[in-house]
Amino acid sequence: MSRRAVESLGETVASLPPREATLVTLPDLHPELSEALHKMGASRLYSHQLEAYERVRAGENVVVATATASGKSLCYKIPAFQNALGRTKSRSIFLYPTKALAQDQLGKIKGFGLPGIHPATYDGDTPQALRADIRRRSNVVLTNPDMLNIGLLPNHEAWGDFLRNLEIVAVDEAHVLRGVFGSHVAAVLRRLRRVAELHGGDPRFVLTSATIANPQELAESLTGLPFSLVDDDGASSGPRRVVFRNPPLLDKEKGERRSLLTEGALVFADLVSRGIRTIAFARSRKAAELIYRYAAERLGIEGARRISPYRAGYTARERRDIEGRLFSGDLLGVVSTNALELGVDVGALDAVVCCGYPGSVASIWQQWGRAGRGKDPSLAVYIAGRDSLDQFLFENPPRVLGRRVEAARVTMENPYILGPHLLAAAHEAPLDAEDERYFGPAYRDVAKKMMEDRMLAASGERLIYARSDSPARNVSLRSASFETVLIADTDGELIGTAEATRAPSELHPGATYLHRGNAYEIEDLDLRLHRAVARRVPNNFYTKPKVETDVEIVEEVETRGLPNGAALHWGRVRTTDSVTFYKKVRVADEKELGVYPLDLPDVTLETQALWVTLPPIPRGARPSFESFGGALHAGEHGMIGLLPLFAMCDRADIGGLSTPAHHQNRLPTIFVYDGYPGGVGISWRGFDAFSSLARDTVGVITRCPCERGCPACIQSPKCGNWNEPLSKTGAVDLLRYLLGQTSKYPAE
């Protein structure tokens, strides 16, 4: 890669040296497996692969946390294949977060050429006619959490022989199993343990993860079992140049910079035009399509033929075609969502461009790791977007380069998540008091609530499912809400779904809804029937709802003092959202086209929150709502903007409210709450790391070059109050007061 190509991109903030591999001889394996590894060029193993193998063979559950492209999959394949070649009845399940990754790994397993290994994918695309044969013949089944939930577990009797001989359960890419999705998967894995034991099975679990702060804790939280950690990476890596780039300022007063999408397209096109094989990662499907389109226009007809977008939503055939063309070198570049962040093999690449913060520092490293596999050199580029978290990382490269990665959290105490899985478990086999060992300390209370709701019924000392349907089919693994709204166009064709709790703000009559680059206007929303109807409209305006939020403190669980008599609290709250108006805004110039009233039912949410209380406003102080309320509001926005750096979540997963006098405590109060029923631990991370969160927020706001606040510091794209009022200087004064850096009350 030429020096000129790198220098054209911006400042190189780091040159990471290569790392030599630590190689060890193969252990005593079945001759066919040893021969297959030799033929594949793996005549020796990386040290971490051998350690994982030996620990699994010793009967331990193992989590492997090493870098991208370090051969983590061999850590579970070798023990699984060794078992199967030595005992014909031995069975394994390999669990992948996506069907695409399972298909990719199926090809790799077949590439071993082992006649005693009979792998098969088992997912929603598997024909019914093949499923019985898979249960009977396959000794390695590749599937995903969704299919485990609705396909295997409810039909465990048919899988009885397989489960009786189940010896290895591998969970690949475990770092993506966090928050709501991870908590659901934790319940699914515990249900798997339960039915396996019912049939006499006792599998070992092997989890692989990108580098995160708490791999062992995550593995134990997901499965409810003790784990050994393997994280001493023995794989080699080539030299890597790291470039951080900020789009140029267009308007200093407003803090407005060139679009992240435009900047990403410029960098991507420049690299591809130089023959550098590149992946650009975008944060959404729409962003990936737009970056590709802008880059194609810049490259011209011939250059555009060598690039492609890649995202979920394409057919399996389309994705395989793109992957194959990239692997073969026919394509020089791909613009992808995080669909390619996971381990689908696309061959040797030279450069990765992260277009904005992808949701975690761990994901940045995962994306960068897609280039320069083995000892090859690579280029890693991070382009900052306009929001506060992107700008914070641009200003603080050590937060990324120092690998200060986040902790991934799951919970088994959220009744909105655990409850549906207890119903599914009771349908699989009656529950009893012993099942607390699978489902944790919340089991008894949640089961009692399910009985009160007549979803479970007593049968002697056991609990049975009280209805005739299949409860597993009512579980959405990616939502903490029971209900979804179906969105159809005027011809009746389904174009999307949304959680019922978000429908009033996102699917109200008149709202714009985007689907595959097309704009729709919601004509009707029926919350009783959980249905919305949308019609195609020109893509030249968008809508913003006005949301009035109230927060009621239900239970204060933890509290601690802050400087100057302020206090920090954490506990359970009940939020009530009222969508009262919406406005139309023209895309071209952000001109407001009109404000329209709405009459919709309130949405309530019981969840977890942190809240900060200030002492009463000093006597004699007469702060205006714009100044003091704006300080509280801006401080709230600033902390919410950076909380994903601590909690490994998305900004949209968090809600907030600030008020100069809360109706329960009569004190100035800022709330930051989990945006999911029951909570998933996001606000707890903010409570636990509050001082660091507040300090980093001060740094973001003070370094931002805008005069009165912008999306890079205190404005929020999700604000239900349309970012009014906000005070940039007031937010800094407030946060410094809470940190004890000043004793001056922020209203004075």
Regions found by a protein language model. Name each.
Residues 704, 709-713:
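Short cysteine clusters
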Residues 209, 714-717:
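Cys/His-coordinated zinc-binding microdomains
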Residues 378-380, 386-404, 419-433, 448-449, ...:
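Extended Lys/Arg-rich polyanion-binding regions
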